[in-house]
């Protein structure tokens, strides 16, 4: 079964071979070895603020000869309570694909259930699959492989952590989540990652950031308070301060380690400016790769290649 016409709601929806197919295409699109003509219309429904995801999806479809419609919920009937089922069925008659950024994974899944076009997860509270595809592309660019590497994620066991668990497992890369005990990833997602990884990679949940960073090839962090968690910010700062990605922690990693952050970054909170702007940071390449990875996703789901 190919990817054309499929949804991308979580990386667990894909086989390892399909993840590799997306990443291979993303690399050839970036290098210019492959060009894709995809004169399709992509709709964006974003209930949360966005810079990289909104712009990279828009640029991706337009650079392939398509067009984008920004369907802000506040200026559509969705914002006035029209059922998702009705909206999804109607938009399927006008558009070729939907990229949706919303809070509840359940809402995204409802869109996918009723839509007759591909629905892409542009971030929910549970998952951020397109971000992790760009992350994996960045890692491969730097190391030429994923096997025998270890990625350590420092911070909240959130949507990014969940998708890193699944994505690393899909490509056979060891993954460690270093987090306070009260902020662990969901057990069902950890179990799914372990199932996918099998004996190809190790999936670990640790609470000691120093031990977790020891010998790692990739150190990765994210903001401590995500959108909608602002009231918890003070408690989160207290809990996550030991997990700050700073030079001392970076020195525990492999000498050739790279630093990733999905952005936006709060300097001197989850990451120091020294590390973010340092020679081992690949954050800006990582952000660029959102464009190439999402071009690959769109091209494959829309049957353009």
From Swiss-Prot:
Transmembrane segments: none annotated. Carbamoyl phosphate binds at residues 50-53, 77, 101, 128-131, 262-263, 290. It comes from the Bacteria. L-ornithine binds at residues 159, 222, 226-227. The keyword Amino-acid biosynthesis applies. It catalyses: carbamoyl phosphate + L-ornithine = L-citrulline + phosphate + H(+). SUPFAM superfamilies: Aspartate/ornithine carbamoyltransferase (SSF53671). One of its GO terms (cellular component) is cytoplasm. Its main location: cytoplasm. InterPro entries: Asp/Orn_carbamoyltranf_P-bd, Asp/Orn_carbamoylTrfase, Asp/Orn_carbamoylTrfase_sf, Asp_carbamoyltransf_Asp/Orn-bd, Orn/put_carbamltrans, OTCase_ArgI. Reversibly catalyzes the transfer of the carbamoyl group from carbamoyl phosphate (CP) to the N(epsilon) atom of ornithine (ORN) to produce L-citrulline. Belongs to the aspartate/ornithine carbamoyltransferase superfamily. OTCase family. This is Ornithine carbamoyltransferase. It comes from Synechococcus elongatus (strain ATCC 33912 / PCC 7942 / FACHB-805).
